[in-house]
UniProtKB/Swiss-Prot annotation:
SUPFAM superfamilies: Glyceraldehyde-3-phosphate dehydrogenase-like, C-terminal domain, NAD(P)-binding Rossmann-fold domains. Its main location: cytoplasm. The keyword Oxidoreductase applies. The keyword NAD applies. Belongs to the DapB family. The active site is at H155 (proton donor/acceptor), K159 (proton donor). This is 4-hydroxy-tetrahydrodipicolinate reductase. It is an enzyme of class 1 (oxidoreductase). Its EC number is 1.17.1.8. It comes from Pseudomonas amygdali pv. tabaci. It catalyses: (S)-2,3,4,5-tetrahydrodipicolinate + NAD(+) + H2O = (2S,4S)-4-hydroxy-2,3,4,5-tetrahydrodipicolinate + NADH + H(+); (S)-2,3,4,5-tetrahydrodipicolinate + NADP(+) + H2O = (2S,4S)-4-hydroxy-2,3,4,5-tetrahydrodipicolinate + NADPH + H(+). GO terms for molecular function: 4-hydroxy-tetrahydrodipicolinate reductase; NAD binding; NADP binding; oxidoreductase activity, acting on CH or CH2 groups, NAD or NADP as acceptor. It holds the Pfam family DapB_N.
Amino acid sequence: MRRIAVVGAAGRMGKTLIEAVQQAPGAGLTAAIDRPDSTLVGADAGELAALGRIGVPLSGDLAKVADEFDVLIDFTHPSVTLKNLAFCRKAGKAMIIGTTGFSAEEKQRLVEAGKDIPIVFAANFSIGVNLCLKLLDTAARVLGDEVDIEITEAHHRHKVDAPSGTALRMGEVVASALGRDLEKVAVYGREGQTGARDRQTIGFATIRAGDVVGDHTVLFAADGERVEITHKASSRMTFAKGAVRAAMWLDGKAPGLYDMQDVLGLH
């Protein structure tokens, strides 16, 4: 059995991950971790996820459950994830990282850790989104410089980073296919007298409202026609199942920083 730990286990995504782990053949939740000051520490992780008792108590200390798992799934916050990364690197534990909002310097720390442990890091673990990334690469190469490109994303009111990591990853894929540097061509929102649009730019628009799980659309607009590639998530379970699939795939893999495209064989 693949022994899996979930950090942030008392949160919305954490509970969904617990359910996904318990549903996956060959996988089992053997540790669940949350903030040390959480009033839920000691509670049964299965009961927190409305699955019934599974005999795995919620821990407030990752080090105390280090011997209980093979791979850690982390969908939390960059500051938390980086602390967990340092621990897993020292302990020789594999990691699945779905946290977004990392700076360029912080992403480099993931690269460095990948020299010692196997890691799957992805902005989005949905199979559909990763298929969209493949389609975006093809669309950008075919349509080339003859289109204006805009990326729109929508998420629930609680999401703290913008644009989403998925939107930025979509922008990176498109920019790379066109031989552009996203940092130089990205335009984040527009206001006032902006002047005529520069076709080399890639625009981003962000919506935060209600309980939207995650919508992403990339628009390729030419004179006379438009192509839109859209993905809409209706449940966090799609991300959780992808993360568990990645955790199973990582079993026996050599140290390295992998992404979901590797897991799905899309490279």
